[in-house]
């Protein structure tokens, strides 16, 4: 195969690869899923840090939020078994207002499932839970 024929084949693929962008819905949904996966893994501080706060919060208040996340997961574990899976079903985005709703399906160890809506806010290019 000649050199020009290879470039004729590779150039369109490079063009598609470089222009293919992830949708805002995918990004917001993936962020929400990641935050809830952190909660499921017991990474409570990371989960709490996933909430949008325009101002900093006192350390003792942050600790209370972490304790609340621990209590929430402990209660769910008692009632349904551990949080076994987090799946993104869909997300909607309002690009003008920089907000989104991510729809997550939570699966528990007792095989029960619950769909939740996670409201999101975009700040400086990152998605946070509201």
Describe the predicted segments one by one.
Residues 66-113:
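Surface-exposed, charged secondary-structure patches
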Residues 113-130:
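Short beta-strand edge/turn micro-motifs at domain boundaries
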Residues 1-7:
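Bacterial N-terminal signal peptides that target proteins for export
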Residues 42-56:
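Short, well-ordered alpha-helical segments enriched in acidic and aromatic residues
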Residues 24-43:
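Short, aromatic-enriched amphipathic alpha-helices that serve as compact interaction elements
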Residues 19-21:
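Bacterial signal peptide processing site
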Residues 14-17:
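C-terminal motif of bacterial Sec signal peptides marking the signal peptidase cleavage site
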């Amino acid at each position: 195969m000649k050199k020009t024929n290879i470039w004729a084949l590779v150039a369109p693929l490079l063009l598609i690869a470089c222009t293919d962008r992830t949708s805002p819905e995918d990004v917001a949904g993936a962020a929400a899923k990641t935050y809830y996966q952190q909660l499921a893994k017991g990474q409570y501080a990371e989960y709490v840090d996933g909430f949008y706060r325009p101002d900093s919060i006192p350390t003792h208040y942050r600790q209370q939020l972490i304790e609340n996340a621990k209590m929430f997961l402990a209660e769910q574990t008692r009632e349904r078994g551990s949080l076994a899976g987090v799946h993104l079903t869909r997300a909607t985005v309002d690009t003008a207002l920089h907000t989104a709703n991510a729809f997550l399906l939570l699966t528990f160890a007792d095989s029960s499932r619950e769909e939740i809506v996670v409201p999101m806010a975009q700040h400086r290019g990152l998605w946070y839970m509201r």
